From Swiss-Prot:
GO terms for cellular component: membrane. Gene3D superfamilies: Farnesyl Diphosphate Synthase (1.10.600.10). Pathway: Carotenoid biosynthesis; beta-carotene biosynthesis; Carotenoid biosynthesis; phytoene biosynthesis; all-trans-phytoene from geranylgeranyl diphosphate: step 1/1. This is Bifunctional lycopene cyclase/phytoene synthase. In the N-terminal section; belongs to the lycopene beta-cyclase family. In the C-terminal section; belongs to the phytoene/squalene synthase family. Keywords: Carotenoid biosynthesis, Isomerase, Membrane, Multifunctional enzyme, Transferase, Transmembrane, Transmembrane helix. It comes from the Eukaryota.
Length: 594
């Protein structure tokens, strides 16, 4: 009896597990826990017969003075725990690296060919066949090594044990796997593999476990690490990552089918539902929906990293609906702001309103309805096709979106040459902030209540939505404080003229000299107004469904951190768009999710 193997876990395997768990705990979802539990169970069930055979045939052994002595099918319990802890660590690392991804956008496979063949791009079918051939070749090689026996036995047992799983995983999800960003797959494989190579080297040198001579090829990756051991940890981590990726593929299928429907599916799917869907569902998708979804995600990443990372804390259909809502609002804003003249901007407002009218008339048709899609796209300009089509009209009221367009009309009233500046008073500022941000916040809460109904009165629900409008204004005030210089460059001043007059300034003076030090106290005043709105709405968040309180609070808190960064850099933020570091955003979101 000994503690050597147990101490390997205490020193090397448990610390990263605890660290990753603590870092990720506020963001854990019930479905993610179920995925990891299932994968750990599969790992134990699949590995026990194989490992038991290795021990019984003396390919692998454990000195009596390095283990506690309790076994399961002759496998030390410390070894069984290794199956669990390795699977847990690798799975959790993969989940963390892929939390930000919007999974359905990867369902159709790579958007660009991965390689060129002799006769042109390699098709998806060819990619599938090549991968299947590769993993089948590994199986044949493993069986051959077992047949040869002797020093090739352990190597053959590893290859023949792992390859059937890899073949199955590849055939079922090769498109999804190839579409994922390469780093999101290979980093969660490489990091734990390298780490376990080091741990295994130390254990082999100490004699904690032993590969019997005559069953290994006696090639070492480096001193103390047998090539079989290096291969074992590599292929097992590949299996784990492919396994959790397969569950993500199943979740992506569920989210896609929910998103294209006209109903709200707030409940988290069970593992059984995901497995059934994964094994039985057709792999035919509406390419328009998937392309538009990818465009919406790209737009969100480019325009607002805070909102992109914040969206990752929401789950399933709700997250997709929020991204689609943001896509329409952002696209409309960009078309109007980037218009070369006022008439073109007015044209785009009219077209946005037209797109809304038509989309809400078609709200009871699914997104993959070809006839409805053609009717919509024939009636509105091409730049609005994707944003209007994805809009979850069946789960939203139209009025706030029309109010948003009215806010854009306020922007058109700015005219430096004529001395026209519509934000004359603090009330004007509040009205503007409501139109361009309060409306969007209210739509977010409408989606929340559609997906996750709660037992509150209609009056209470409306009060919470009203508080959401105030929160939206807080975010807009923060934007205004941040973008004084950038807004002045396009002839806009959102600081009320009455406030400017108190400092002896006019809107025209701000446009001419947007870095005037007299603007610093006014910027503080706007931030104070933002903070006041933020504080007023905190109690209302507790009335939201429990599973979205954390994500809403974290998203808003992380965004409001912009205001704190502005205060810390009052004289240094005139040039360019202020950025909040990822670590700082993560810290604020982590604390808010607790």
């Amino acid at each position: 009896m000994g503690l050597d193997y147990l101490m390997v876990h205490v020193k090397y395997n448990l610390p990263p597990a605890l660290l990753l768990t603590i870092l990720y705990k506020p963001f854990f979802t019930r479905l993610e826990v179920h995925k990891i539990v299932l994968l750990c169970t599969i790992a134990v069930v699949w590995t026990i017969p194989w490992d038991s055979y290795l021990i019984r045939t003396r390919i692998w052994s454990y000195p009596a003075d390095s283990v506690l002595g309790q076994t399961l099918f002759q496998i030390p319990l410390e070894e069984v725990f290794f199956f669990i802890i390795q699977t847990y660590n690798t799975s959790l690392l993969y989940i963390i690296f892929n939390k930000r991804l919007v999974l359905p956008s990867y369902l159709s496979g790579p958007t660009k060919p991965l390689a060129q063949g002799l006769f042109g791009p390699i098709t998806h079918r060819t990619q599938r066949d090549l991968g299947t051939l590769f993993f089948t070749g590994i199986l044949i090689l493993g069986i051959s090594f077992i047949y040869i026996g002797g020093e090739y036995m352990y190597l053959g047992l590893i290859l023949s044990w792992v390859s059937p799983i890899l073949v199955m995983q590849w055939v079922l999800m090769y498109r999804f796997l190839l579409a994922l960003p390469p780093a999101s797959v290979w980093v969660p494989i490489a990091l734990p593999t390298l780490y376990l190579w080091v741990v295994d080297t130390l254990a082999l040198r100490r004699g904690t476990w032993v590969i019997e001579s005559g069953t290994k090829v006696d090639i070492q990756l480096w001193e103390g690490l047998e090539i079989e051991e290096a291969l074992f940890f590599l292929v097992t981590n590949v299996m784990v990552v492919f396994g959790i990726a397969a569950m993500h593929n199943a979740a992506a299928l569920f989210e896609y089918k929910a998103f294209i429907s006209t109903t709200a599916m707030g409940d988290t799917p069970s593992i059984y539902q995901l497995i059934t869907l994964f094994l039985t569902s057709s792999r035919l998708y509406d390419t328009n929906v998937l392309q538009e979804m990818s465009q919406a995600v790209t737009l969100l990443k480019q325009k607002s990293q805070s909102m992109y990372l914040g969206s990752a804390m929401f789950e399933g259909q709700l997250r997709l609906d929020l991204i689609a809502l943001y896509s329409f609002c952002r696209k409309a804003d960009d078309l109007i702001d980037d218009a070369p003249d006022r008439e073109t901007a007015k044209y785009w407002i009219e077209q946005c309103e037209k797109a809304l009218e038509l989309r809400f008339k078609l709200k009871e048709t699914a997104l993959d309805d070809t006839e409805a899609y053609q009717l919509l796209t024939k009636s509105i300009p091409q730049p609005l096709h994707a944003a209007a089509h994805l809009l979850p009209a069946s789960r939203l009221p139209k009025e706030p979106l029309s109010c948003l367009l009215q806010g854009f009309e306020i922007d058109l009233k700015f005219d430096f040459e004529k001395g026209s500046f519509p934000i004359a008073t603090e009330h004007d500022l509040e009205v503007y902030a409501y139109h361009v941000a309060g409306t969007v916040a209210s739509l977010l809460l409408e989606l929340v209540f559609r997906h996750h109904p709660v037992s509150i009165s209609e009056a209470e629900r409306l009060r919470v939505i009203s508080a959401g409008e105030v929160m939206g204004r807080a975010l807009q005030y923060t934007n205004i404080a941040r973008d004084i210089t950038r807004d002045a460059e396009i002839g806009r001043v959102y600081i009320p003229s009455s406030w400017l007059a108190e400092e002896g300034l006019t809107p025209s003076m701000v446009i001419s000299h947007p870095r005037n030090s007299k603007l610093i106290p006014l910027r503080r005043r706007i931030l104070e107004k933002a903070d006041k709105c933020y504080c007023e709405t905190q109690e209302a968040i507790s009335k939201l469904p429990s599973n979205v309180q954390g994500p809403v609070r974290a998203t808003v808190t992380a965004y409001m951190e912009i205001g704190q960064v502005i205060r810390e850099n009052e004289t240094k933020i005139w040039n360019g768009k202020l950025k909040v570091s990822r670590w700082r955003r993560f810290k604020r979101a982590w604390l808010a999710m607790l």
